[in-house]
């Protein structure tokens, strides 16, 4: 098919080049030879009268003229798939797809493990690429470079649809042998004790409790920063440090690590874990099927949900804590 001199089959090649950023990998992904992929690039360059890609550090980086094309090309291909190709109902036993999902280490451990176990039985052809929290997940969603984002919903963009998974609350926790935690924990003591805190991404984005403390103008004595929640419980063991972490994470570790939950001196609010997907994938049958699986598993394991006070969305996802 051609449109104003452009072979629309080249859309697939351009989409893959934008995703892979490597000529050989892109060619292999769509079963083209490297010379054929090079020819496709040449034809795109002639069409747009622009280099489109510049080689930097062995990668094909889009030029300013090419960068806006990525979401447009991806959306065009998805519309063709959804409008022209007849989709059969998803048969889990025969479904073959890899989903790319951004989520925290905490959610991978306490929630997504259940998805993996279930689909290993029901849909063995489904695989996953679990990705750490990115500094700009909204941009990845906009381009359709990831299939799902699992986060507290207060950190999510309003530009894409989302679905609630479950409510979570934060608790203060320390080692069971910590003598400073024998009685009630007052705010002054909480602020003066050494804390272990999690931060995410290369930009060290704050976690939920850090954002809440920042909103109240409170500054803890953070003695140890780790790249995720799951490292915190083991690093509290045998120390006098404390941390503020999700309750489900404490429950996961309480049989193997001597932990003590203390009533928090602050009225820390509960928050909602949610799943979000690109607007480009709203009608994608595979994406719909996968999101329904996640919602089912969250409902099956964590109902009824407690009544909570909802946090407002922070002004910036990139807020930093001191």
Curated annotation (Swiss-Prot):
Residues 23-42 bind DNA. Residues 6-63 form the HTH lysR-type domain. GO terms for molecular function: DNA binding; DNA-binding transcription factor activity. Pfam families: HTH_1, LysR_substrate. SUPFAM superfamilies: Periplasmic binding protein-like II (SSF53850), Winged helix' DNA-binding domain (SSF46785). Disulfide bonds: none annotated. Keywords: Activator, DNA-binding, Nodulation, Plasmid, Repressor, Transcription, Transcription regulation. Gene3D superfamilies: Periplasmic binding protein-like II, Winged helix-like DNA-binding domain superfamily/Winged helix DNA-binding domain. It comes from the Bacteria. Belongs to the LysR transcriptional regulatory family. NodD regulates the expression of the nodABCFE genes which encode other nodulation proteins. NodD is also a negative regulator of its own expression. Binds flavonoids as inducers. This is Nodulation protein D. It comes from Rhizobium leguminosarum.
């Amino acid at each position: 098919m051609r449109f104003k001199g452009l072979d629309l089959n080249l859309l697939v090649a351009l989409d893959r080049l934008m995703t892979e950023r490597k000529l050989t990998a892109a060619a292999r992904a769509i079963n083209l030879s490297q010379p054929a992929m090079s020819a496709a690039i040449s034809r795109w360059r002639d069409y747009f009268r622009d280099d489109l890609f510049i080689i930097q550090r062995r990668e094909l980086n889009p030029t300013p003229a090419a960068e806006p094309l990525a979401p447009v090309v991806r959306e065009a291909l998805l519309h063709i798939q959804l409008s022209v190709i007849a989709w059969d109902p998803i048969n889990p036993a025969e479904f073959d797809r890899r989903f790319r999902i951004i989520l925290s280490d905490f959610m991978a451990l306490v929630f997504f493990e259940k998805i993996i176990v279930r689909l290993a039985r029901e849909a063995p052809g489904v695989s996953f690429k679990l990705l750490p929290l990115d500094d700009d997940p909204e941009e990845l969603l906009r381009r359709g470079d990831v299939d799902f984002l699992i986060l507290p919903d207060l950190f999510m963009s309003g530009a894409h649809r989302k679905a609630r998974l479950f409510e979570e609350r934060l608790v203060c926790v320390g080692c069971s042998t910590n003598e400073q935690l024998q009685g009630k924990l007052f705010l002054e003591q909480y602020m003066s004790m050494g804390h272990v805190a999690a931060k995410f991404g290369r930009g060290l984005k704050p976690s939920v409790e850090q954002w809440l403390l920042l909103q109240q103008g409170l500054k803890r004595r953070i003695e140890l920063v780790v790249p995720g929640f799951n490292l915190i419980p083991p690093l509290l063991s045998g120390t006098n440090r404390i941390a503020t972490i999700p309750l489900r994470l404490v429950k996961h570790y309480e049989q193997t690590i001597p932990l003590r939950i203390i009533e928090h001196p602050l009225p820390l609010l509960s928050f909602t874990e949610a799943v979000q997907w690109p607007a480009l994938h709203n009608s994608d049958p595979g994406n719909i099927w996968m999101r329904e699986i996640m919602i089912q598993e969250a409902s099956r394991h964590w109902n009824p949900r407690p009544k909570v006070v909802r946090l407002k969305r922070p002004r910036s996802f990139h807020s930093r804590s001191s």
